[in-house]
């Protein structure tokens, strides 16, 4: 009864929720029905609290719909339901691996194999290297916001249950948005939980270099043994595998071997897996076997929080109005924000002057001037029109069909987000519209970004295009 009832709920929730949300929060839940009490088991406290906060009403509604007057009471626990001892597993084919990678983490019976660095004694010196995980990048100094919330949540779950929760985890987004920080944070957390865990972080080019050295030294078997013995392999900028056929071939087999052993893989890229050119389709398909999450440019509040956090790290007092002044003008990525703040702090130290808005305007005058030239309302209109294959004149017209109205609302919201123009100025640039029309458009797009995966994806794509 419990399996069929919960299966009905799962099927309906899968239709109602965005695919990423369903995969991350709902699919890992297990169900058990006893004495008319349905217990949902979450893999950790974080997932339990999130599901209870976000989806409790939806689950109760479905139980009422499917059970009528005989609705079971609902409770949540951290853990897993009691299951019978598993039968010996048959030999698995690649198709079996593909099917299992999308199953709930708790149904995967094998545990990650933990090895120590001593296992690599036979690996030649050029190939054998330590973890490269940066101890400075941890979860507690990663600034969370709407733009990175899902990525951070997925990274935390992976670090709590490596090899079982979302394998592989694929993070994508523009430069300087925090993908590398999350990789290191996962690596640090895994080692904190298990000091014997073998975690390796590297840029994809290092993998290529290691393979070339192994071929030169006739040590390809040692290369394979080393990479397939890790508990977690964290590879940055996987797009640099493009057009490197021999490296892709070796990584393909390494990828399969790690997944077979329930060893964690986390990859990052500057674009969605299927959009990576020069990489074999079989690899791109595998990149999407687990969970794929976009890391978006930080919104204003997150940019301010990042500046305040970095100022605190430097033991510098940064007034709120100064942080907002910088954050409103530098929007593309975290690295740019940090660089600008470092310049402001250095100038303040050299001159002994207090950090005010006027001081920041002077210290960053060339950067601010360049930024204002980069994104204009005119540029936004042209980019949106091209993206939706309509004319700029359509955006300025009085037409109200959805094929025009929605892109117009998106363009207005982008103008508010990416420029310093007031609402009346934006309205005037869109065919002389009233500022209340612009405000309505901004609120509508903000709402749709929460409800519609397509609108969220379009908005992110346009932000990346305009900020690159």
Curated annotation (Swiss-Prot):
Region of interest: Domain IV, binds dsDNA: 349-468
Domain II: annotated span: 84-131
Residues involved in ATP binding: 176, 178-180
Top-rank lineage group of the source organism: Bacteria
Region (Domain III, AAA+ region): 132-348
Ranges for region Disordered: 85-104
GO BP terms: DNA replication initiation; regulation of DNA replication
GO CC annotations on file: cytoplasm; plasma membrane
CDD domains named among the record's database cross-references: AAA, Bac_DnaA_C
One of the record's GO molecular function terms: lipid binding
InterPro entries linked to this entry: AAA+_ATPase (IPR003593), Chromosome_initiator_DnaA (IPR001957), Chromosome_initiator_DnaA-like (IPR020591), Chromosome_initiator_DnaA_CS (IPR018312), DnaA_C (IPR013159), DnaA_dom (IPR013317), DnaA_N_dom (IPR024633), DnaA_N_sf (IPR038454)
Compartments it resides in: Cytoplasm
Disulfide bond residue pairs: none
Induction comment: Represses its own transcription.
Segments of this protein annotated with the region Domain I, interacts with DnaA modulators: 1-84
Keyword vocabulary terms for this entry: ATP-binding, Cytoplasm, DNA replication, DNA-binding, Lipid-binding, Nucleotide-binding, Repressor, Transcription, Transcription regulation
SMART domains: AAA (SM00382), Bac_DnaA_C (SM00760)
Pfam family, one: DnaA_N
Annotated Low complexity bias: 85-95
PANTHER family according to UniProt: CHROMOSOMAL REPLICATION INITIATOR PROTEIN DNAA
NCBIfam families cross-referenced by the UniProt entry: DnaA (TIGR00362)
Similarity-based family: Belongs to the DnaA family.
Assembly and binders: Oligomerizes as a right-handed, spiral filament on DNA at oriC.
Name this protein carries in UniProt: Chromosomal replication initiator protein DnaA
Lineage start: Bacteria, Pseudomonadati, Pseudomonadota, Gammaproteobacteria, Vibrionales
Gene that encodes the chain: dnaA
